[in-house]
Curated annotation (Swiss-Prot):
Gene Ontology terms: cellular component: plasma membrane-derived thylakoid membrane; proton-transporting ATP synthase complex; proton-transporting two-sector ATPase complex, proton-transporting domain
Subcellular location as annotated: Cellular thylakoid membrane
Cited function: F(1)F(0) ATP synthase produces ATP from ADP in the presence of a proton or sodium gradient. F-type ATPases consist of two structural domains, F(1) containing the extramembraneous catalytic core and F(0) containing the membrane proton channel, linked together by a central stalk and a peripheral stalk. During catalysis, ATP synthesis in the catalytic domain of F(1) is coupled via a rotary mechanism of the central stalk subunits to proton translocation. Key component of the F(0) channel; it plays a direct role in translocation across the membrane. A homomeric c-ring of between 10-14 subunits forms the central stalk rotor element with the F(1) delta and epsilon subunits.
Cross-referenced HAMAP family: ATP_synth_c_bact
Self-association and partners: F-type ATPases have 2 components, F(1) - the catalytic core - and F(0) - the membrane proton channel. F(1) has five subunits: alpha(3), beta(3), gamma(1), delta(1), epsilon(1). F(0) has four main subunits: a(1), b(1), b'(1) and c(10-14). The alpha and beta chains form an alternating ring which encloses part of the gamma chain. F(1) is attached to F(0) by a central stalk formed by the gamma and epsilon chains, while a peripheral stalk is formed by the delta, b and b' chains.
Any one GO molecular-function label of the UniProt entry: lipid binding
Ranges that cross the membrane: 6-26, 57-77
Topology term for the membrane: Multi-pass membrane protein
Gene3D superfamilies in alphabetical order: F1F0 ATP synthase subunit C (1.20.20.10)
Protein name stated in the entry: ATP synthase subunit c
């Protein structure tokens, strides 16, 4: 692998992880804030809100893990090499 391809792969891997973490990070913050607000308004619905929040947080975190997988493929099993 030449040095230009290696450098581009490292930069692409960094962008994959960084950009894949921005969206879910913002979404998780908004979801947690809305859940806290909902629990404050209706404490009796805390169980349902918490369950829905945890499920949605898991789906959002999956997007970040996909970005990590793409970065690892670019670094260790580079299809462009």
């Amino acid at each position: 692998m030449d040095s230009l391809t290696a450098a581009a792969s490292v930069i692409a891997a960094a962008l994959a992880v960084g950009l894949a973490a921005i969206g879910p990070g913002i979404g998780q913050g908004n979801a947690a804030g809305s859940a806290a607000e909902g629990i404050a308004r209706q404490p009796e619905a805390e169980g349902k809100i918490r369950g829905t929040l945890l499920l949605s947080l898991a789906f959002m975190e999956a997007l970040t893990i996909y970005g990590l997988v793409v970065a690892l493929v670019l670094l260790f099993a580079n299809p462009f090499a």
